[in-house]
Amino acid sequence: IRGDLNEEISKEKLRIWEYRLDPGLFSGYNPFCAVNILHDRLFIEYEKTDMTTYLNRRGMVFCDGKPLKQVALYHEGSYWVEANGQTVHFRLPKDADPAEHKIEITCREQCFAPEIPFLSYIRVKGLTCAHAATGAPVPQRGALSCYRGHHWIIEDCTIDWSNAVGIDVGNECWHHEFIPGQIIGHSVVRGCTIKDA
């Protein structure tokens, strides 16, 4: 087994943990199965772009409230996902035992969003959204979402550790068909804190 800079790591020191994801944790959406970018994007200059971020899985793993870094291999303080999205392997900082820490995974794409689009004149105040498995770049579904609605007021909310998009207040995606007369946007976001995203 090799570590950074070709430094030998003894198998006795290296502690890698495996967690098989229970499908019951997910309601129609397993973020560990979905990559950040879902389709070919014309705006990406592939020969000049490191595609790692785009091809990482949307699911995240947290240890004591802090995210582990998603990597392809076994680096300390990191995790990686098997190709089928059903098993997560992780290595904690200092090769710690997970029984001594609080381990969390993301289970949902969004924390707060309406079931139907175009709702209007809604006020959301003081809500905290954490650990959303949102994707990027489109569709832009935030941890807190207006889902194409209009005239929302979102204030004094906190978004913590969203994978990609914290708050969305627009059309979500430029591919949506424009409906004549339909109002989207015109929302106010104030006093909110988006951190560690």
Label each residue range with its predicted role.
Residues 1-148, 152-153, 158-160, 166-168, ...:
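Extracellular polysaccharide-degrading/modifying enzymes targeting complex plant/algal/animal polysaccharides
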Residues 141, 184, 189:
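Short coil/loop residues immediately preceding or within conserved phosphate-binding loops
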Residues 189-197:
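Short, intrinsically disordered, charge-balanced linker/junction segments flanking boundaries
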